[in-house]
Design a protein with these regions (language model features):
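Exported/extracytosolic protein signature
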Residues: 1-258
């Protein structure tokens, strides 16, 4: 007689995806900044979303991290600076199943599962963080939100930092985002062509405006000068704007009596 017996195995190779982004609420101010542009002292709110794209699989011992933040954009010190959402409380975990008699088929014992609690741990390390999740089933996206504050030491820098994720049964994936910290530092120096004048002389003023912070760009700059001394009047059409090479530059010049 022909005998048959069955055995069940669980092939479990997860496929991870990762997406890193940031939010810039300061765009609402309408100050002409770019989407990825922040000022010194402003908060940068990052999001990292990791998902398991392989149907039927469970990513085991998933590790998500972002350890590439510079000192000037380190994770904030508050306890809620890192939060994790989307982690399931429990999963249905495949098991070997019920022992059955040999030399026969037992389809009623196929695909047995047990309920398994899912653990999630958040750890600070260096300037960043590590999140460990015990199990991540198919199409169960989890999101790590974390908050940093731009410091003076990174002013003028474009900061690219990278988040990554891997599991015991999934290859490592990475994603990066770039922000620019742009807090210009303006300097104004005003001089005259000579130290003394007599009645009827023409006084020639020279105002040099510079932006001193490397890597920064000042936008929509307004330079204003008011003559406070009685008896001194501004000559119409005498205001000329020149660039650093001495070439006359276009500008919106508004001239009043003083």
């Amino acid at each position: 007689p022909v005998s048959q017996d069955d055995a069940e195995v669980y092939v479990n190779t997860a496929v991870l995806s990762i997406e890193k982004s940031f939010q810039n609420p300061y765009l609402a101010a309408g100050d002409g900044r770019a989407e990825n542009e922040f000022r010194v002292g402003e908060q940068v709110n990052y999001q990292v979303t990791v998902n398991n794209l392989q149907k039927g699989s469970i990513a085991r011992n998933l590790v998500i991290s972002d350890l590439s933040l510079p000192e000037g954009l380190a994770l904030d010190g508050a306890e809620d600076a890192v939060t994790v959402s989307g982690v399931p409380a429990v999963i249905q975990n495949p098991v070997a199943g019920t022992d059955d008699a040999g030399n026969q088929l037992n389809p009623e014992n196929y695909k047995e599962t047990v309920e398994k609690p899912v653990s999630c741990q958040v750890t600070r390390q260096g300037t960043g963080w590590i999140v460990t999740i015990s199990d991540l089933p198919y199409q169960t996206p989890v999101t790590v939100n974390f908050r940093c504050t731009a410091q003076e030491s990174v002013n003028g820098m474009e900061i690219v930092n990278t988040a990554q994720a891997y599991a015991d049964n999934a290859q490592k994936v990475k994603d990066s985002s770039k922000i620019w910290v742009n807090s210009p530092v303006l300097n104004v120096e005003k001089t005259t062509d000579k130290p003394f004048y007599k009645y009827g002389d023409i006084i020639t003023y020279r105002i040099v405006l510079t932006q001193e912070q490397t890597g920064c760009v000042a936008r929509n700059v307004t330079l204003q000068d008011v003559i406070d001394t009685q008896g001194v009047r501004l000559l119409k059409d005498s205001v000329i704007l020149m660039d650093e090479k001495g070439n006359v530059a276009d500008a919106d010049v508004q001239i009043n009596d003083d």
